Amino acid sequence: MLAEIISIGDELLIGQVVNTNATFISKCLDEIGISTRRILTVSDKPDCIERQLADSLSHADLVLTTGGLGPTHDDITKKIIADFFGLGYEFNEEAFERCKALFARRGREMPASNRSQGEVIEGSVVLQNTRGTAPGMILQNLPNYEGKFVVIMPGVPYEMQEMMRVSVVPFFQPHSKHFIKHTSLMTAGIGESTLAEQIGEVKAFLPDGSTLAFLPHSVGVRLRVSSKGENFQAVQKEHAQVVDALKARIGGYLYATTDMPLEEHIGELLKSRGLSIATAESCTGGLIANRLTNIPGSSAYFYQGFVTYSNEAKIKALGVREETLAAHGAVSEETAQEMAAGCLEKTGSDIAISTTGIAGPGGGTEIKPVGMVCIGVATSAKLGSRSFAKTMIFWADRLLNKERFSEAALNLVRELLNAS
């Protein structure tokens, strides 16, 4: 079964609202083996909706729309779709009573205009809205469109998501004849082209039902492996074989087989070994500490974070020597090492990670260009009392450079833990 998603609303076209609905719907469909062919956004003008509905029905078995189901004059989706198929309305008492009850719970009288939300397209399967006032509908057995389905849902994400999970997915699950299995292979410290070369042999001999998608992020790549077929056990077996072959090829660049951010993986490593970490950041401005503490339970391993942006702060807070700054500059491996060593000494943590660099857009030189970062690491006796630094250079704007600096620092911690 092929699906197309039509998101309706001028607010989407002008960028006022981000279209999260289409992403959610396509994920839900994928989980039950329904492939999304296209995602389209159209204006809430009648001719735009009509043209797109006709076009989508000519290509897909299932068309899902969101938006335009409210009680105001510009909410016209229900009328346009009913007129398109030459269908009338019928009154759904349950939907109307739900709407009245919602206003009553809020201590408000229901406006007369909301009575229209009890009207549904005749012959439709009504999708009750447990979080709002507008019911959804599934249209089937449509004149001139035998075997086609149209799903109409509200545009409010909070309402649509519940309707999709509770009503739409269970309705269409029996209609799908395919099983789909996905695995995300999360890598760090490797670029897309290098990874493609490394797994080239596996890619060349992929079974017909399996595909690979390269999804690059800051300093690594998420490799999505997908397998599809009509026999559940065969899909599972084929998928496992492909994943195992890829894991063997990727080697130490692989850190997870689920959609897990690097900071979560590092948190698991630290927690499992009873280790703590502290940060001393200059160019990343606390981003590493922020990422580590975004993970629930991070208090078990995150000790403290310093943001020492100025040279004076590096000297006072971390004990970086003035002589080091004078001789090598703030952006140097020597300074990064002293920042990490000072952080380790002051916190007593097991690992200290530091960053000092040039995020841009200004401040770069021929020797120290924009995008250069020096990352320092210091460890306690538990990890061999090590102290070292590494220089890396990226090419991006200021915010993306900061993101890449933080990712590179976290990956250095990962490599350290894996080697210890």
Curated annotation (Swiss-Prot):
Pfam families for the chain: CinA (PF02464), CinA_KH (PF18146), MoCF_biosynth (PF00994)
InterPro entries from the UniProt entry: CinA, CinA-like_C, CinA_C, CinA_KH, Competence-induced_CinA, MoaB/Mog-like_dom_sf, MoaB/Mog_dom
SMART domains: MoCF_biosynth
Gene3D superfamilies tied to this protein: 3.30.70.2860, CinA-like, MoaB/Mog-like domain
CDD domains: cinA
Stored HAMAP family: CinA_B
Family from the record: Belongs to the CinA family.
Name listed for the protein in its UniProt record: CinA-like protein
Species classification: Bacteria, Pseudomonadati, Chlorobiota, Chlorobiia, Chlorobiales
